[in-house]
Structures are given as structure tokens and as C-alpha cells.
């Protein structure tokens, strides 16, 4: 009997061109993981709308991100490599999770405070609820491993909190 692979989930915001930091910080590791884990790698188009609202540019960026990542060695035959927005279950789960995410939790997020300080003209609900959407992305796949940058570690802690609150209210649904 074959052992079931553990699940990895991570997302990439399509906001610019792939650069060496992306490659050495994430892509190289994604390529290594694809043989050992069941991988879900997402182009996070909804997340990018929080800071890059031009939808024409977004569509072009999404296509380019797919091409760049495949060129770096990500194999669509080995991983689920998909765009976030067509997965409607994400939006539904995001709605439920927002009921578990209190205003105080979200306002103390370091990334939110940084964005408010850097761009006070663009303080939108998407920025405030970014960790909630990220939680939906993660727990939808029941991911055990979620490789993220240092700036996203607080979001992972919040994801655990939101998932635990969801389980407490609705029963043990998510690991």
C-alpha cells in the first residue's frame, strides 16, 4: 500500500516579473517539493487586487506567472498549478472564515499596518481581510506545509486561529 503524500500549498501574487529573489526564495524549493509532496501552487489573483487593481494588467500577469514558473521547472503533470479566482469554494470559505476573524485580530497584522503606512490612500477591506482569504486558500486543501516568506508568518498563525475557531463553531472540519 502506497503512503499518501503530505500536502503543500503556496501562492504567488502576479504583481510583477519573476526575479532572482522569487527564484531562490520560492521557486527552486517548489520544484524540489513537487516530487515528494502533493503540491497545490496558486496564482493569487484575488490577493493581488489589494494593491494592484488594474484587471487588464492582472490577466496578462497571471498568464506570465504560469509561463515563468513552468519555465523554472514546475511540472503541471506533478502539481496542481491553478489560478485562485475560478475556485468558487475559496470565496465561500472566505465568507465563513470572516465570521471567525475579529476586527482587532486583523488590524494588528504587521503587513496591514505596513501597507496603511506606505499607502494611506489605498486602505481597503481586501488588505484588512487578506489573512482570512489566505486561510481559505490554505485550509481548502488541508495543507500540512505552507511555505511563505517571513512577512507572511503572522498570517499562518492567524490561519491556525481562524481554522480552530471554525472547527469549534461548526465541528472538526479542518486539520
Residue ranges and their predicted role:
Residues 113-175:
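Active-site cores that bind ATP or allylic diphosphates and position pyrophosphate for catalysis
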Residues 2-136, 161:
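N-terminal Rossmann-like or analogous alpha/beta NTP/dinucleotide-binding catalytic cores
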Amino acid at each position: 500500500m502506497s503512503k499518501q503524500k503530505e500536502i503543500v500549498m503556496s501562492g504567488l501574487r502576479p504583481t510583477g516579473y519573476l526575479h532572482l529573489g522569487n527564484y531562490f526564495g520560492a521557486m527552486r524549493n517548489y520544484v524540489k517539493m513537487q516530487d515528494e509532496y502533493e503540491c497545490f501552487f496558486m496564482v493569487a489573483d484575488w490577493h493581488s487586487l489589494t494593491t494592484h487593481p488594474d484587471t487588464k494588467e492582472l490577466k496578462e500577469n497571471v498568464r506570465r506567472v504560469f509561463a515563468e514558473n513552468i519555465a523554472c521547472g514546475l511540472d503541471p503533470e506533478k502539481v496542481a498549478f491553478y489560478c485562485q479566482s475560478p475556485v468558487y469554494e475559496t470565496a465561500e470559505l472566505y465568507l465563513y472564515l470572516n465570521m471567525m476573524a475579529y476586527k482587532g485580530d486583523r488590524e494588528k497584522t504587521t503587513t496591514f499596518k505596513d501597507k496603511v503606512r506606505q499607502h494611506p490612500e489605498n486602505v481597503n477591506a481586501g488588505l484588512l481581510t487578506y489573512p482570512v482569504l489566505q486561510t481559505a486558500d490554505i485550509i481548502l486543501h488541508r495543507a500540512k506545509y505552507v511555505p511563505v516568506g517571513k512577512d507572511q508568518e503572522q498570517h499562518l498563525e492567524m490561519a491556525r486561529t481562524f481554522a480552530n475557531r471554525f472547527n469549534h463553531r461548526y465541528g472538526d472540519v479542518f486539520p
